[in-house]
Amino acid sequence: QDVALRSWLSAHGYTTTVTGGGNVLVAPQSNAQTLSLFKAGAVDGAWLPEPWASRLRLEAGATTLVDEATLWPQGRFVTTNLVVSTTYLQAHPEQVKALLQGAVAADAAIAADPEGSRDSVGSAITALTGAKLSTQVLHEAWSRLTITPDPIASSLQASATAAAAVGITKSPPDLSGIYDLTLLNQVLTASGRPTVSAGGLGKE
């Protein structure tokens, strides 16, 4: 979120610094805190993932100025990756493969019944957090998400490059080898689904 916001501001002629300088003050904070501060009029805007973006619109009267999906090729960019340590992967490949099989099966179940899956996720959020999303927030947020086994590797590299450009890192981090999609592609092939690419950032 921080990188995406600063990058967009820079592209439109605004300046920010990681120490709070520039002509736009960017204050990194939790999504929940952002909602509270926006309701109180203490912040003017926010760059948020779902369901927080929908909550700001529906619960606090915010207006969408930029939909990040419009900034990426085909509207696709990564927000969440499933990760394990290299040590764990090497020591327990069968467990990792079983985890991936579950993730791919869940992806297929969501595609087969998106509305039922949406409602199940809403119930799980309530059970895990004790907080219930309103039906309107849940429906709107879900409509803006795409669940996929594709890591969309090119978007991770682009974000890393942007982080350096806006001063969050001194230089673009070396992401070589960050992906090992070998087991994932085995699971996808066994499921009759297309394999996915590491975008030159690791094994496939």
Regions found by a protein language model. Give the residues of each.
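Conserved C-terminal helix/tail region of periplasmic/extracytoplasmic solute-binding proteins
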Residues: T161-E204
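A local structural motif
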Residues: S10-S30, A40-V43, T169-P173
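Pocket-lining segment of extracytoplasmic ligand-binding domains
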Residues: G20-N23, Q33-I125
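Short linear loop/turn motifs
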Residues: G22-L25, Q136-T146, D174-Q186
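Secondary-structure end/capping motifs
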Residues: Q90-K170
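Secondary-structure junction motif
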Residues: Q1-L5
